[in-house]
């Protein structure tokens, strides 16, 4: 699905877990500076990605990850809308649907960098690494993952990097962790939170 927002073209696609692990890099790989790259890389909480999130992926049958936002560089992206049958228009939405659905192709030279969802990506990479534990559930590598591909029309490498670094900063600056009250209300795996919720309901 293709969409536009001021200054950006973005596309919602799906990748297999093994494809995402192989093809998508981390934001620190966008930096031209080795020092800045190392600094960004250290921001990834490896213990959280490999232990907590890896355990979640390997042990839960109802596992689910939200979309990973990815910057796409190079590769000559091309968007081609698909042809739909206008007769199949029961809901009167044909025009809107026809504009949104299509095929996004690259020439093979593209590079992907995770702007949001780096810990999710790290946990997937770790789980599919045969040298690490825990082991992935059967068939995990072929499960689908939602990816949001971000494109910019800036051809100059410097302008491209500035724009995507700004987006990376915005996405992560305004991210807000779940507060304790919301955790108590919504949590279904933390025994303490569940007991607290029951006490509050009966008091």
In which residue ranges do the predicted regions lie?
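N-terminal extension/subdomain marker
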Residues: 1-80, 85-94, 101-104
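Basic- and aromatic-enriched surface patches that contact anionic nucleotides/nucleic acids
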Residues: 64, 70, 74-75, 81-203
């Amino acid at each position: 699905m293709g969409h536009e927002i001021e200054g950006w073209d973005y596309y919602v696609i799906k990748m297999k877990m093994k494809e995402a692990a192989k093809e998508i890099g981390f934001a620190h790989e966008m930096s031209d500076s080795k020092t800045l790259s190392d600094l960004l890389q250290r921001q990834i909480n490896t213990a959280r990605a490999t232990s907590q999130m890896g355990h979640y992926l390997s042990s839960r049958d109802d596992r689910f990850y939200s979309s990973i936002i990815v910057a796409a560089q190079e590769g000559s992206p091309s968007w081609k809308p698909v042809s739909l049958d206008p007769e199949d228009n029961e809901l009167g939405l044909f025009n809107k649907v026809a504009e949104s659905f299509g095929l996004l192709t690259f020439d093979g030279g593209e590079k992907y960098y995770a702007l949001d969802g780096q810990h999710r990506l790290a946990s997937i990479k770790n789980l599919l690494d045969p040298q690490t534990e825990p082991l992935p559930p059967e068939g995990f590598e072929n499960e689908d993952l939602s990816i949001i591909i971000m494109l910019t029309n800036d051809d100059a490498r410097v302008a491209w990097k500035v724009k995507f670094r700004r987006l990376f900063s915005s996405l992560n600056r305004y991210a807000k962790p779940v507060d304790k009250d919301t955790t108590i209300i919504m949590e279904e795996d933390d025994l303490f939170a569940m007991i607290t919720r029951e006490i509050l309901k009966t008091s």
